[in-house]
């Protein structure tokens, strides 16, 4: 693996439900690296779910907390596989920090394929609550333009989580971006 990549955290970005956590766990096992899910770390430390945090403390509090955790990860850890929440890259400061200090992989999925997963996602994704299908599609497209800032894009539409993880490991070993 390219030395420049080997010493960096590998950050997975993409829309909610694309498989960042599942794929990240698989990649971490294949590479023998630790896995960090930023949302899970926040939930563990605050002893509440992200939906509960949105409800009790508000989205602004969550986004600030998320930024602090991501900055901490970027500045003080190396060599991990890290899953960011789907909205994290909306914050320009987070984008810049991750792109500067980490190797960022965008897990892409077509709207039609994401829509098939939607019913499984809505309950645990507060930003989807009370949105129409048109509003969800708009959010999907807005975030997709933000995810354009990355080092490697991986299409997940025609791959299982295992196949996607294998592809990522192969690309990292080749040092391709």
UniProtKB/Swiss-Prot annotation:
Protein residues bound to Mg(2+): 21
Domain of life: Bacteria
Cofactor(s) this protein cannot do without: Mg(2+)
Keyword Kinase carried by entry: yes
InterPro entries: P-loop_NTPase, Shikimate/glucono_kinase, Shikimate_kinase/TSH1, Shikimate_kinase_CS
Pathway annotation: Metabolic intermediate biosynthesis; chorismate biosynthesis; chorismate from D-erythrose 4-phosphate and phosphoenolpyruvate: step 5/7
Free-text cofactor note: Binds 1 Mg(2+) ion per subunit.
Binding residues for substrate: 39, 63, 86, 143
Catalytic reactions of this protein: shikimate + ATP = 3-phosphoshikimate + ADP + H(+)
Its EC number(s): 2.7.1.71
HAMAP family: Shikimate_kinase
Protein name: Shikimate kinase
């Amino acid at each position: 693996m390219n030395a420049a990549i080997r010493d960096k955290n590998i950050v997975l970005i993409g829309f909610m439900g694309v498989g960042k956590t599942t794929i990240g766990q698989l990649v971490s096992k294949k590479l023998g690296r630790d896995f960090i899910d930023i949302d899970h770390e926040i939930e563990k430390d605050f002893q509440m779910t992200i939906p509960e945090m949105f409800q009790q403390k508000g989205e602004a509090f969550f986004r600030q907390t998320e930024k602090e955790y991501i900055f901490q990860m970027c500045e003080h850890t190396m060599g991990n596989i890290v899953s960011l929440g789907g909205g994290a890259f909306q914050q320009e400061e987070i984008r810049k920090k991750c792109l500067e200090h980490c190797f960022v992989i965008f897990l892409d999925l077509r709207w039609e394929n994401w829509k098939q997963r939607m019913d499984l996602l809505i309950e645990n994704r507060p930003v989807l609550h009370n949105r129409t299908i048109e509003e969800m599609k708009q959010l999907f497209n807005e975030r997709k333009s933000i995810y354009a800032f990355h080092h490697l894009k991986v299409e997940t539409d025609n791959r299982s989580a295992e196949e996607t993880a294998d592809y990522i490991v192969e690309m990292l070993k080749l040092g391709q971006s």
